[in-house]
Design a protein with these regions (language model features):
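Juxtamembrane intracellular "pre-TM" segments in multi-pass secondary transporters
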Residues: 158-178
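Symmetry-related core transmembrane helices of the 12-TM Major Facilitator Superfamily/SLC fold
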Residues: 49-56, 137-155
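A membrane-interface helix-boundary motif in multi-pass transporters
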Residues: 40-47, 128-145
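Glycine-rich segments within core transmembrane alpha-helices of 12-TM secondary carriers
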Residues: 21-25, 105-130
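C-terminal ends and interior cores of transmembrane alpha-helices
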Residues: 47-67
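Central cavity-lining transmembrane alpha-helices of secondary-active solute carriers
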Residues: 12-36
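Cytoplasmic helix-loop-helix junction between adjacent transmembrane helices
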Residues: 80-115
Length: 178
């Protein structure tokens, strides 16, 4: 954003609005716990949907010339962040369902560490691409990397029950069978 001449005020506005979906995670969790398509798995459904939606939300930014912080940029990045927040909730829930209690602390540490390293690497890569090639190209690379990340949940299989427990029918959950 600095490379296009955005002011500190513009960048602050963009960041403050695009972070709003993260404050709404508390309301999204019960929705993710309640609705699913059994064909994809209880959590994997939300991970797949949110990853596709993340890519679709930023894809216009590959074609739109970004010359300033404006309503379109803020809207698309806020929408993108909403789906990132949904994916974050679903991935955490998948980990909680897939791990035994004695594994959760270590897994949580690895997840946080991986997220921190990923953000650092991602920021360095994005900054290099944005400055070296342009913002549109940066969003194209982002979409390509998200497409690669999409392969993990596509080819993984989710447990139909909580790890360490027998398979149970989940009460209070709407499951759509195909």
């Amino acid at each position: 954003l600095v490379s296009i001449g955005a002011s500190v005020k513009d960048i602050s506005l963009l960041l403050s609005i695009t972070m709003v979906p993260w404050t709404l995670k508390v309301f999204l969790g019960p929705i993710i716990d309640s609705f699913t398509l059994s064909r994809f798995g209880r959590r994997r459904f939300w991970i797949l949907i949110s990853q596709v939606a993340m890519m679709l939300a930023v894809s216009p930014l590959v074609f739109i010339e970004v010359t300033q912080v404006n309503f379109i940029l803020i809207s698309l990045l806020t929408l993108h962040n909403a789906f990132v927040a949904i994916s974050d909730i679903a991935i955490d829930a998948l980990a909680a369902d897939s791990l035994r209690k004695d594994q959760m602390a270590n897994a949580n540490g690895f997840m946080w560490g991986s997220k921190t390293l990923g953000r650092g690497f991602g920021m360095a890569l994005a900054t290099s691409i944005f400055y070296g090639y342009g913002i549109n190209e940066g969003f194209l690379v982002l979409i390509l990397l998200m497409s690669l990340a999409f392969l993990f949940p596509i080819f993984s299989k989710e447990l139909s029950h909580k790890a360490g427990q027998q398979e149970l029918s989940h009460k209070n959950r709407l499951t759509l069978n195909e």
